[in-house]
């Protein structure tokens, strides 16, 4: 005769099924790390993920279109504006990666930044990048129109520990040949302390909340059925095992 699974066993089965249905995602990495580049730069996109034995074939997508390259690294020797967009990859044993955006700009100077949104206390690194690595002299970095660093050559601007007041609009300027060139402005935002993020992370995403609610309902229903059928089975056994005594009337 069939028996109901205990509630805990049901939850374990559902949880295990949920985990196996979500394989690990691949990850796209940029080399160099900048996702804002100038035309004619070299860009390498690397796909990190699990591969089957002796098979490192990789799928690449650019703006949703499958690329012919099937190598773990996708190399662009002379990047063009049309190479801008979102890139995704997938290995043989991984789910498709989240998209990574690449922006190709036209100009003499480009202010490159590792992250445009930075947590308080984390470093900020800015690079005044020139087209085809043309020599640049008298480089200046500006925030909200005010000069923050000056160097005779081209050096990076590094802020060891970001503070809220470091948020703002940044650009760089320098001399190329006999011309004074400037980059486009880049908005950098320094986030509030981690405590605010900790509070917000206390609340689960909507799909996890839905899963917990469904599991709670299933647990309650299964528990009720489990004990109901158990009482019914016990009553049936007592009826079968009970003895009936007949007596003659007067």
From Swiss-Prot:
Q: Which UniProt keywords apply?
A: Cell membrane, Disulfide bond, Glycoprotein, IgG-binding protein, Immunoglobulin domain, Membrane, Receptor, Repeat, Signal, Transmembrane, Transmembrane helix
User: Could you tell me where this protein is found in the cell?
Assistant: Cell membrane
| UniProt GO cellular component terms | external side of plasma membrane
Tell me the InterPro entries matching this sequence: Ig-like_dom, Ig-like_dom_sf, Ig-like_fold, Ig_Fc_receptor, Ig_sub
Q: Which GO terms describe its molecular function?
A: IgE receptor activity; IgG binding; IgG receptor activity
Q: Where are the transmembrane segments?
A: 209-225
Gene3D superfamilies xrefs:
Immunoglobulins
Signal peptide feature range: 1-16
Record GO biological process: antibody-dependent cellular cytotoxicity; cell surface receptor signaling pathway; dendritic cell antigen processing and presentation; Fc receptor-mediated immune complex endocytosis; neutrophil activation; positive regulation of bone resorption
Task: List the Pfam families hit by this protein, alphabetically.
Answer: Ig_2 (PF13895)
Record site feature (Important for receptor turnover), residues? 222
Q: What is its main location?
A: membrane
Location of the Ig-like C2-type domain = 23-105, 99-189
Quaternary structure and partners = Forms a heterooligomeric complex with ITAM-containing signaling subunits FCER1G. Interacts (via transmembrane domain) with signaling subunits; this interaction is a prerequisite for receptor complex expression on the cell surface and intracellular signal transduction. Binds the Fc region of antigen-complexed IgG.
Its biological purpose is as follows: Receptor for the invariable Fc fragment of immunoglobulin gamma (IgG). Optimally activated upon binding of clustered antigen-IgG complexes displayed on cell surfaces, triggers lysis of antibody-coated cells, a process known as antibody-dependent cellular cytotoxicity (ADCC). Does not bind free monomeric IgG, thus avoiding inappropriate effector cell activation in the absence of antigenic trigger. Mediates IgG effector functions on natural killer (NK) cells.
According to UniProt, the name of this protein is Low affinity immunoglobulin gamma Fc region receptor III-A
Q: Native species of this protein?
A: Bos taurus (Bovine)
Phylogenetic placement of the source organism: Eukaryota, Metazoa, Chordata, Craniata, Vertebrata
């Amino acid at each position: 005769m069939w028996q109901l699974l205990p509630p805990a066993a049901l939850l374990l089965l559902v949880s295990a099924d949920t985990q196996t249905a979500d394989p690990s995602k691949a990850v796209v990495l940029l080399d160099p790390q900048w996702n804002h580049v100038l035309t004619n730069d070299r860009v390498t996109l690397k796909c990190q993920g699990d591969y089957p034995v002796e098979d490192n074939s990789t799928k690449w997508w650019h703006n949703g279109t499958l690329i012919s390259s099937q190598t773990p690294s996708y190399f662009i020797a002379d990047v063009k504006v049309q190479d801008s967009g979102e890139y995704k990859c997938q290995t043989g044993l991984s789910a498709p990666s989240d998209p990574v955006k690449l922006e190709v700009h036209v100009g003499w100077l480009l202010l490159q930044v590792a992250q445009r949104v930075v947590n308080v206390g984390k470093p900020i690194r800015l690079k005044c990048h020139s087209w085809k690595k043309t020599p640049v002299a008298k480089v200046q970095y500006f925030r909200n129109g005010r000069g923050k660093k000056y160097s005779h050559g081209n050096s990076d601007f590094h802020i060891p520990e970001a503070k809220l007041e470091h948020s703002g609009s940044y650009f760089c300027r320098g001399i190329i040949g006999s011309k004074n060139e400037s980059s486009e402005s880049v908005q950098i935002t320094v986030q509030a302390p981690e405590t605010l993020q900790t509070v917000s992370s206390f609340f689960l995403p909507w799909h996890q909340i839905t899963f917990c609610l469904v599991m709670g309902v299933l647990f309650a229903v299964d528990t009720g059925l489990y004990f109901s059928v158990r009482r019914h089975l016990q009553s049936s056994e007592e009826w079968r095992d009970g003895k009936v005594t007949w007596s003659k009337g007067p």
